[in-house]
């Protein structure tokens, strides 16, 4: 899939070059979010405000790219899929605070940085997909993924992916490093195959009988359900809203940082504020099946039918702080090598 993303990146760079030369009212957005998920929302922003959004997409490495571009970087905002990516951008020194009364009013304190360095625009739950036919448990915890009764029955995408390092970061916060290592070793021992693909592949593999359970983001259930070629995968699974034994459901988010050298700061702030408006939050929920970050905006009905996530007592800041340790743990236990023979 990676090779197919080069064209949007090059096209985005060309848009930036032409837009900057023209001096039009615009904002330059670097993003790790798939264009198909975010572009319809950005098009609505442009239609309502007249501000053009120049989009540059890459699967990873955009914070480092902005750093290398220095004060010549055209990027005004970085929109990413994981809190740790945003805190990494802050650590690289490429951001400035994004604090306004509108953002503070709309977004709860738990979903924005205390120092104003980042702000969430949507939230997602890391849930368990389970076979309807082969798994009868009404509830499961994340710890259950390491239970020997699931040996040879677990599927996940690679542990190095941000969605899984986020979950592992939360596990470290809940269990401590030693118990988290034992847990991840247990999950590896239960793998049905070498981690590969994405979250949709977890549902696909369960439907094919390759595995019985796996972890994936909730919103993919909604996306697959409206895809005629993938709906059968959804029909084969139950969605279980898991918790940690002494905590809640792991929630991560997609969010924004304002770049240090933003040339279109006013437009960037305008976009950030618009993304947390009720209208934009409703679009996020309806189009992307994510959880709104703004109180009072309804969860998409299909997703709401799977139940409400239990609030976790581990903050996103704690998840971000454990990111390096989580990545090292994935490597240490050899998770992405797959099940041991």
Predicted regions and their residues:
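Early extracytoplasmic/lumenal segment of secretory-pathway proteins
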Residues: 25-87
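Short beta-strand->loop
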Residues: 30-33, 114-115, 130-132, 137, ...
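A structural signal for short loop-to-beta-strand junctions that line the ligand-binding cleft
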Residues: 73-78, 96-128, 143, 153-156
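Periplasmic solute-binding protein
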Residues: 83-94, 113-140, 168-169, 251-257
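Short helix-loop capping/hinge motifs at secondary-structure junctions, enriched
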Residues: 133-140, 173-181, 262-268
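Ligand-binding pocket segment of bilobal, Venus flytrap-like solute-binding proteins
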Residues: 163, 170, 175-242
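Mature extracytoplasmic/periplasmic domains
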Residues: 254-313
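Conserved C-terminal helix/tail region of periplasmic/extracytoplasmic solute-binding proteins
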Residues: 312-341
